[in-house]
Each structure stands twice: as C-alpha cells, then as structure tokens.
Swiss-Prot record:
Gene Ontology MF annotations: protein phosphatase activator activity
Highest classification ranks of the organism: Eukaryota, Metazoa, Chordata, Craniata, Vertebrata
PANTHER family listed in its UniProt record: ATP SYNTHASE GAMMA-RELATED, SERINE_THREONINE-PROTEIN PHOSPHATASE 4 REGULATORY SUBUNIT 3A
Function: Regulatory subunit of serine/threonine-protein phosphatase 4.
Domain WH1: 1-100
Organism: Xenopus laevis
Family listed: Belongs to the SMEK family.
Any Gene Ontology CC annotation: nucleoplasm
GO biological process, one term: DNA damage response
Subunit architecture: Serine/threonine-protein phosphatase 4 (PP4) occurs in different assemblies of the catalytic and one or more regulatory subunits.
Biased composition (Acidic residues): 793-808
Biased composition (Low complexity): 761-774
Region of interest: Disordered: 744-822
Name listed for the protein in its UniProt record: Serine/threonine-protein phosphatase 4 regulatory subunit 3
Amino acid sequence: MTDTRRRVKVYTLNEDRQWDDRGTGHVSSGYVERLKGMSLLVRAESDGSLLLESKINTNTAYQKQQDTLIVWSEAENYDLALSFQEKAGCDEIWEKICQVQGKDPSVDITQDLVDESEEERFDDMSSPGLELPSCELSRLEEIAEVVASSLPSPLRREKLAVALENEGYLKKLLELFHVCEDLENIEGLHHLYEVIKGIFLLNRTALFEVMFSEDCMMDIIGCLEYDPSLPTQRKHREFLTKTAKFKEVIPISDPELKQKIHQTYRVQYIQDVVLPTPSVFEENMLSTLHSFIFFNKVEIVGMLQEDEKFLTELFAHLTDEATDDEKRQELVNFLKEFCAFSQTLQPQNRDAFFKTLSNMGILPALEVILGMDDPQVRSAATDIFSYLVEYNPSMVREFVMQEAQQNDDDILLINLIIEHMICDTDPELGGAVQLTGLLRTLVDPENMLATTNKTEKTEFLGFFYKHCMHVLTAPLLANTTEEKPSKDDFQAAQLLALILELLTFCVEHHTYHIKNYIINKDILRRVLVLMSSMHSFLGLCALRFMRKIVGLKDEFYNRYIVKSFLFEPVVKAFLNNGSRYNLMNSAILEIFEYIRVEDIKSLTAHVVENYWKALEDVEYVQTFKGLKLRYDQQRERQDNPKLDSMRSILRNHRYRRDARSIEDEEEMWFNTDEDDLEDGEPVVLPSEKIKNSEDLMDPISKFMERKKLKESEEKEVLLKTNLTGRQSPNFKLSFSGATKTNLTSQLSASGHPGSPGSPGSPGSPESPGSVSKSTPQAAAITTKGGLIGLVDYPDDDEEDDDNDEEEKEERLPLTKKARLGS
C-alpha cells in the first residue's frame, strides 16, 4: 500500500447497539482493483490478516470524533469505527477520505447526498448557510419545523448543525425552556421536545459536547420529559437528582474523573430511558451517541487504573474485616461495574488492567466476599470471578494451587465456587449454570500451559482431584446410596445433571486422573442409579456419561463395567421403557450398537452371557441379534484355535504375495464362478436370513475340482523347471476327495478373496451380522511325505532349511508358487 500505516483498533456496532472489538492493526489507504476504487485497509498486527477492507464511497457519511475516531455506516445497520492511537494518524486518514469525496478536511463530517436530486443538491450547495428563526417563545413552532425539514437532507443537516454551534443557539433554547416551564406553556414545551429530539438525530459530536456539559445536561433531560405523545409529563430529573444517588465508595480526588462518571451515567440514562425507541432509520442516526458513551467508559477505566491510591484503598477496604456489610456490598458492586467497563478496552490495555487487579489482590478479596451471607454480594463476586476466568484461567489456577499449601480444603477459592454452585437457591439454577461453565474452563486442558520446567495440566489436575473433586461429587454420592435416587425433585435433578455434564467433560478430556477416581469411588455405579429417576433428562445424562466411558474402548473401564455388572441398570431402563419410541430407547440402542460395530469383545461377551434372555425377543432392530452373532463367532474361534490359526496363516501369506498374483487369482475366481453358475441363478449373500455353508457348497466344490486340475498342471510345470536347473519347492498342496467337503466348509469361513466367506466379507467371522459354520476337522495337506498337519512343514526342526526353502519359493515365477491363499 502507498500510505504510511497507522495503529488502529477496529470496532463494529452489534445488534444491541454496542461496539464490538474486531482487533488491532495498521490502517492504510490505496487503490483496490477488486473494489474499483480507493479503499481503507486494516491488517492485523499479530499475523497480518485483513481485518477491514472498505471502499471509500463518495456517498458515505464519515465522521471524525474526539480527534482519534472515524465513524461511518458501511450499510444499513452496519456501523464501523476506527480508533487511532495517534491523532496524526487519524488526521492523515481523514484527509485521504475527504480527498476521495472532494470534501473539506476541516469539517468533521462528510455528507451522504444519495437521497437528493441533482437540482436540490445544486440549490443547497449554492445557497448560503441556514438562517434559524430568532429564539423567541412565539417562534418555537417555526423553529421545530425548520429542524424537522432539515433532517431528511444531509446538506441541510450539516448547515443546521453549524448554525446551532456558531450562534450559541442551544443555550438560548434552554433559556426558553425555563420560561415555558415557569409559564406552564405546555404547547411550547412540546415544540421544544421535538427540537431537542431532532438535534439528537443530527448525530453531531460537537453538539453533544454542549448538550452533555454540566450546565446543560439536566435542562436537556427536562425538555425530553414533555413528549407530546404521552398524556403526562415524565419525571426523569426527579429520578436522577433524588432517587439515583451517586455514592463514592472510595473518595475520588480527581474532579475531571468524577465529572466524567456523572456525565456517562446520565447520557446512558438518556439513551436507555429518556429517548423514545428509535426507528431503524433513526437508530443509524444515533451512532454518535453510542460512540460517545463507549469511549467515555474507556476513558473512565483508564483514569481509574492510573490512580494507584484509589485502587489500593479499594482493596484494603474489601479485605478489611472491620468493613461493614453494606459498605462491602457497595465496594463489590463498584468493582463489578469497573470490570464490566474494562471489556471496552483494547487487548493490551485490558491485559494491563487485569494485571493491576491481580497485583492488588483481587483473588484473595473475592475469597472473602464469597464467604459472605448476602446473596447479592455473592452474585456480584461471581460475575467478577467470571471476568477473571475468561481473561486468564491460568492466573486463577496458579492462585488456588498456591493457596492449597496454606489453607484447608474447605476454604479454598475453587471449593467455595463449587459450594455456591451446589447451594444455588434459584429455581432455574441460573447461578449454578454460570459456575459450571467457569469450572469447565478451569479444568479444560486445552487452555493449560505446558513449559519445559513445569506442566500446568499435570499439576492442576492432580490438585483438583485431590482437593476439589470430592466436593463436586458429594451431592451425587449422597443421593445415590440406594437403588433409586433418594431426592428426585426437579431442582435436585437439574443440579445432578450439571454435575454429570462436568464429569462427562472430565472423562473425555482427562486421562488417568478421572479413570482412577471413577474406579476407586465406584462413580459409574452411582451415576447409573439415576437411570431410574422420574426425570428423563437426568436418566439421559447418566447414560451419556456411560456412553462416553464405553466410547474410550479402555479395557480398564471395560473390566470395571463387567466386574460390577454395570449394564444391569441400562437393560432395566430399556425394558421398563417398553415399546415407547423415544430418546431413551434410541440412546440405549445406540450404546449396544456401538459395542457391536466396534467389536468390543469383553462387553459383547458380558452382555450376551448375562442379558441375552431378556433381550432376545427384541425384533424391531437387529442390534441384539448382531451382538449374539459376534459372541458366537468369538466362542467359535476360542473352541477351534487351529481354525483361527489357519485363517491367520492363509491371510498373512496372501498379503505377502505380489499384487499381480492376487489380481490374477481374483480374476480367475470371478470368471470361473460366472461360467459355472446357471443363468439367472440368484446370488444369495450370507448376510441374508437363509445362510449356511451348504448353500455355498456346490459352486465352491466345482471350483475346488478345477483347482485340483490346475495344480496337477502346475506340478508338471515344476518338474520341467527342475529339469532346467530350477529347484522346486519342498512341498505343494493337493486335495483329496475325502477332505474336499471339509475344506470347502473352511473356505467359506476364511478362504478366497471375493468369495462369500472371505475375510472382510459379510459372511466372515470377523465381520458383523454374519453367520458361518465350519467343521471341526482341518483340511489335510498332502506332501511327498504323506499327510501332515496344516501348519507342519517337512524338516520342521531345521529352521534354517525352512528359511532357505521359503526364499526359493519366493524366487519362483508367480504362476508356479504354491497357492496358500487359495
């Protein structure tokens, strides 16, 4: 970009009319080809990413405020602001905007001329400045008409604003206000209301500075009490002077700071209460008012932060035991508002702010406050604590770990937070929900630091499970001593659901800490007691906790579940749910389906051996029958280890062979199968209801006969090879008719690639939902020495000879190798 970069903060106005911080970067201006014009560009100082790319349109109204702000509306209901670190940078960018728009840089607002016709624009530009009627009681109606007629035209709004500024007109209007009130001239007061409301819509910073000055503020509010659309006068001034009392919880020595606090409170009151709810059009015209409040708050926080005497005194009073409860409540409320204002700061300033609070001892002070009986004070302290956790959870963790070395568990800050969560008296548990979120942030390993000399995750989690976890689980353990929850009202169920949500998070993100705690304290058994709660959401929370544990596929957890028969409450809940098709039904089926699909053998065996009779009649899903099938296949492999070994050997040997050999063999299988099967004969997969090895016998038997013929041909080839000097393999396979049937049955379980019984196919023992039967007899292998076992090799005792023979076999042509995988 051509221009010098300047450091800025980018803000956007959200739907709640609050400014959102979009990041800090450097602004420049330059021609952007894609936008076909000069544009403002802001690149983030952290990574150089583009924070803002905004074309400088000739019909967009830009405003310069408070020397370091430029504000404009990018589109309807989308306002932007650039807050400059230096005035020089703001002036430079402002000049660039005015240069593009052809405006005078000495004027603090450029105008949008889009609503005016060319003729009107020429008339307005050629006419002299706007001349206001003289400020007299009899001409109030005329003044109101001039203001109202100027609002639609940007140029007329500008001229009206200049006239009001230059002639001291505002103060003369406020003098008329006093006259009208003294005379009880209601009509004149109604006209003044319209005039003052119109001046607000001029959206002019210079006018606001006059209106919100100490001399004029209350009179401006007085004018806005006489809304002609309301039958009676509003009492805003009475509220601000008599009801809303300003209390200095700590004396403020700086008069400028005190005046700024008064001003900000009253302007906020005008925006929120006094002014009528603006229309969409008027809302865009009040953007300067929002900005005025926002940047006032930033200034207040900065001034307070720099006053070390004030902050020192504040924290001294907070932690002093002699401070009475009422005074402490005022101090806490002030500190809460102070922290809320800090959210308007730029990140680097916010870092300095919270670092200052930390150095002043805000966490020990919060510990004292949380121990008080007043619920309002505790609520304010919780809000302050949430600001700290969101800003820097590591700072809070470090404090509580240091504190544990000096104090008992009962008075640890984090345990106080847990106790407040448990003891929340709100029927909706609003405070408990907030505190659960804070605890979750604190125990989340994702935001924990790991350095070369220490690991925050290990240290803090060790501390938490030793000193705090028993406090968190106390309500759960107390409520689950019997087979049903001892307390099952709605509020208790809500609290237990929050605790389970946090424990589920721990299962997912922590490792041995939570595992040891669950197994040692038998937590899962206690949690599953809640499956019998009358509140279905609590039962689902308990099931979700177990599902998270099962999903880890950890054998430590699985052995614990099996040993303690922890599927029993789940099965009971499933049966008690009956035929109702609801979330509980689906969630329970899903956990069993997960066990089947993932083939978790220990849990599969446990469920089938203990609960099959109760579940075998469930026909509307195949989940339980699939589990039974898995179990039968496991038992079959256990009862016939030779078969399992053969399957493994054949499969491993097959995987060692060249890919071209596999492709040739597969092609041979499919071609042969296609030729010999009768035309129109349907192919029945083993996953269908009617599936057994006899259905597949005929085509496979035919294939085996062809295989015998091919192998006899291979034998002749091998003999010829020997004659040419190539050494033949030490053995090769041949099949006798007596063993053909048995081997065919074996092949249906673990034989040929692409066949109905091959590994990985729907009919294999390793795949779900299949049934395969094999005879206990193993296929015979005939060698030169006669019949030997399937895995026996000649000269088995001579290991070196075996290796030599294997090497020789590997050197054979692909077509001459013994087909162990076929």
